[in-house]
Amino acid sequence: MQNIELSCITDIDEFHSLRESWNTLNDRSANGTIFSSWEWLFSWWETYQHDADRQLFLLICRRDDALIGIAPLQILNHPKRYFPCSKQLMLLGTGETDGGLVLTEYLDLIIEPGLESRVTEEISNFLLEKQDMWQGATFQQLLADSHLSKLFGGQRLSIQSKTIDNGFRTLIDLPETYKDYLMSLRKKKRNNITRMYTRLQTEQDYVVDTITDGLDTDVAITELADLNRERRGQLEQPSAFECPNFEAFHRLVVKRLLPLDKVQIRILRIEGKAVAGLYSLIDGDIMHAYQSGFEAELGHRYALLTMMITQEISHCIEDPRLSQFNFMYSADENSYKLRYSAYTEPMYDLNYFPRNKRTDLYQFLHGPVKQRVKLLLKKR
């Protein structure tokens, strides 16, 4: 059996040089997604490397010089007072400290098919040997079949693991025709979509501009950000686009994904004014609806968010590459997204903490105490 060589990359220039081999492996890996692509994670590191005290910690597995495994990790150094550990192992693309969560979902180890067990074991052994470099770990928004769930399998650990439910991804299996899709909806929803679309067509002379047909990416991001801020403002919720790093990251990653035909931004205009926008990611046979926004008055009169989503679903049905439409993260299993004939799949966080009293206190405060406070606040 051929030996696997494992190395640790901490230098951004070495990370940059991995682009081609990284993406080749990511495309082959069973759990590889656009969120584990080089374009997404390198752009994230370029943007967020100075957001906090972070250290790049990429674990690279090779066999006969061929790349066969990647653990896309970082070490986040917290203040010494942090409970329950100050050196936290995390996945790249997660752990932003400025409030602008990028939501890099479904991350995992990137492994050559057929070598999952061996590569996971090599990574586990390396991490245990280097445990002086980290004290705990948090891996967020994993799916049920994650390779990370098998990390440290069979090992006697000085750390303890805990899984915590963390929302759902919400999917639509695309039918053969858009008519079939409409018929899958409840009658009230279907009639509302048809009525609003007819109203928009008869009352307004509108156009939809796209970045794949010449709309400048920076213009598109600026307009989308403004519309997202307006939408979130109506809901009295903060917009991630208020955070400069979040917007900078997306300006960067969209420009890298566009030549690969893996991104789309649509801006709907009425009388030249941007009134609705949808930002989507093309990931193999899945379209991820990532961010959206709309202008208040016209947005409600024509249900513009619904229009943008259902028209995007129509485009997906016509695209032979695509078989699923993904609304991405929902905190609630019974989200409004289910009205679009969607279904949910659970996600979870996997945490590793030291076995000590500080951990017990941390878990108590962030478990029953935190939930109790949330309930009390809801009753106010």
Located regions from the model:
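N-acyltransferase acceptor-side catalytic subdomain
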Residues: 1-380
